[in-house]
Amino acid sequence: MLKLLPEPKRAVENRGYTTSFRNIGIGLEALPSPEKQEYLEIARMRFWNRKELGIVPEGGSEGCIEATIIPSLANIEADGGDLFLKQGYYLNVDRDTIVLKYQNKAGFINAITTLKQLLKKNGDGFALPLCEITDWPTVEHRAVAPTFSWYAGYGRIGFDMQLWGYDEWLEYLNVCIDNKINQMNMVMYGYWPFELEEYPETVFRDVPIKIWNKENGRWLTVRYTHPNIEDHFLADFIAMAHKFDFSIFAYVGLNSYNGAYSIKHPEKRMVKPAGSGFMNDFDSVCLSDGENTNYILASMRKISELGFDGFTLEESEEGFWFCNCDRCNERWGRVSSSPVEAKHKANLWLLNLIYKEVRSVNSKAVIGIRAYRQPPLEKDPAFLRECVESMPKDIALFWAPALYVPPTEFKKWIAAFGKERIWGRDTEANAITSTMGRLFRVFESNMIRYRDEPNVQVIERDIEQHITSAQEGVSGINGFMFEWYGLFMFQWAHGNYGWGSKMDRDEFTRLSCEIAFGKELGKRVLVVLKSILTIHESQMPFYTMPFPFQKNKLTVADIPEIQQARLRHPVLLEEIHAIQREIEADPDLAQYIQHFARIENAERRNAVIYEMALASLRYECAVSLEEKERHLDEILHYNEMDFDLVKEMFFDINPVSETGMKSCMYPYHEIKRIIHNMRHPENPDTAVICSGIEALGWLWL
């Protein structure tokens, strides 16, 4: 069997391998002259992680296997229709020659990528398995959604890929293309990671942050600026992506966390209902204020001018209330049956304004929305028809239902909007992991009592949605990749199942690890990834601040499973260390060094969190005040140990509060506040620290 992902549509493996070679000669005689150098350069760049292999003009060097490039798929039988012609390819690898056929540039890129993936080391050279492949995607637009900035200034400053510069983004682009992904929907929430001259206060520049100085054992206040503001690399990155027929979309708010405008101008926020307990009034601005809409339109115009190919506009997740100012009540509130309906109507009005503004800059820009995600999750067909009639006919949907509803709900949306307008679903498991303070969550097995967990988003659910999306023939998939290090399995799943594979999940995870790490090491890596048990600190019973992304509260019935994880930990950690040593010794695996550093840190934290969780359960069972106090001391001790490991590795670890509400993705600070209040009710600290402001819109779960 060919070890190849994404899984090709048709592949025949013939016995044996090519002769050994150190170079591939790219025969471009059949191409028009202007394309020859471009395609040769594309081929060279596609071998970004195979530098020791030369990509040369045909016949250009010794030890060379010749690849004849034919820009035509005529007489190649395939049932892929237009997608075969747009992005498909044909490869025939014989003992001494390669034939590569394609119709369009994307097909050439996909074919060269497959060729690279098939390479086997052979002494001081390489060989390819003898094979014939005819391949094409089932889904045209295969996107991932990474984070360029995420709630910056609102809930955090930045972590993981949000701290990258050009070189890291270029490597990630290459990883995407290796997985035959052809689009990024780059999240930009909070302070803008680009210059907006009309509104400089909204730009991600000189934001104060306290960082841990291990040398002196104290906090230092520094001012942080987004890497793209420092180096202005975004235009070059978009241009590089376009060389590979790769689209870059802006994933921004539809009146939701647009720049730092509602931070710097709190008077522009929506007006909460009088006397309500709602905490998040900083998400959106009042749409009856002309200055606010002017700001939003100026932001969208600027993003269009930066060269993005399209927009993913996300509607606010706050669906329980809507602006209560007199003008918003008059325009939308009084003609709606609920706050969420008023929000939809106001946002559709804004969407039409944005549509015109963006198209005035780029008439070809794709404009899509992520909307209608709040209860009721099963929509009335009449409501969907009204939505269709209220927006331009070419608006794409980057969210369509899947979870928490019966399968018929997806078909209902397809019937209402048309499959060509659906570009994404609820494949957000990686985004859920990214809320958890750098802990590890990929599989069902990483969670305690998964079957009881209200939030079901794990890689298994993402795969199911990709498979059914491909079966229904929708236009696109959108796999969330809000966090990269340690979470590579999500990327592989988005690539494989977005391409149209129906492979068994267990076979996919086994094969993907074997391809990446080799047969023996791959087995060990997969065992580690599936054996990690992650308890989020908020699952301790005394923790009162809602955290909807891992909601099960621990009980004494969970003690045996926690004890098993405790016993497993030393062996698991040593295996992680052994894997790290092998990766560090192999230049071909160097790209995984940071991934396993993150996994190692998460597993060391897990061991501490197990002890803290058990102490919290002892506290719940304690009868005497003395016992309770002793267990609270234990919890605080382990809380400090957990945070010491956080400080050891991560940058953005303290609450941010510019909005007027404190937020931090690490529960450490809120644990201290809660225990202080338990011990000192006469002097309470009332400034709650939410575990990421993204949690506030999910409290319905």
Protein language model annotation of sequence segments:
Residues S20-K51:
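Short, charged N-terminal beta->alpha structural module
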Residues M1-R22, E29-S33, G60-S61, R301, ...:
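Substrate-binding groove of N-acetylhexosamine-processing glycoside hydrolases
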Residues V285-D289, E315-E357:
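Active-site cleft segment of glycoside hydrolase catalytic domains centered on the general acid/base Glu
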Residues W150, G190-W192, V252-S256, E317-G319, ...:
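Active-site-proximal loop/turn and secondary-structure-junction residues that shape catalytic pockets
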Residues Y261, H265-E267, E314-C328, A590, ...:
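Active-site-proximal, well-structured secondary-structure segments within enzyme catalytic domains
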Residues G25-I26, G54-L83, K101:
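Short, well-ordered secondary-structure micro-motifs within conserved domains or adaptor modules
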